[in-house]
Design a protein with these regions (language model features):
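Single-pass transmembrane signal-anchor helices and their membrane-water interface zones
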Residues: 1-10
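Short, small/hydrophobic-biased targeting/export segments
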Residues: 13-105
Length: 105
């Protein structure tokens, strides 16, 4: 019997930004979008962010001031929802223990 090693498919690395409890944190993303994380929030994006689309995952609450780019959508994923914009400002609150996500324009 011969065993052959195969390389695992390349896994996309993620960048993770967090705001500790009692702290707010401002992050500038590679596309110049400004994100203000509320206390306890976590924002994740893959290292290929901004190559074909601008997709982030959010756990918690954050205010987004999205850099306008009509060619690449900006997508916020949280829980079972996706919020898709091209360039605007809005707030998303989506905590794991909450029943609903709340988006405010």
């Amino acid at each position: 019997m011969r065993m052959q090693e195969t390389a695992a498919p390349a896994r996309k690395e993620s960048l993770i930004y967090t705001a500790a409890a009692g702290e707010k944190k401002t992050v500038i993303l590679p596309d110049n979008t400004k994100v203000m994380l509320n206390s306890g929030a976590k924002l994740m994006l893959s290292d290929d962010f901004n190559e074909t689309e601008r997709r982030v995952d959010l756990d918690g609450e954050a205010f987004f001031d999205v850099a306008r780019n009509p060619e690449k959508l900006f997508i916020v994923c949280c829980r079972d929802n996706e919020y898709i914009v091209r360039g605007t400002s809005f707030n998303v609150s989506s905590y794991v223990n909450d029943r609903f996500s709340i988006v405010t324009l």
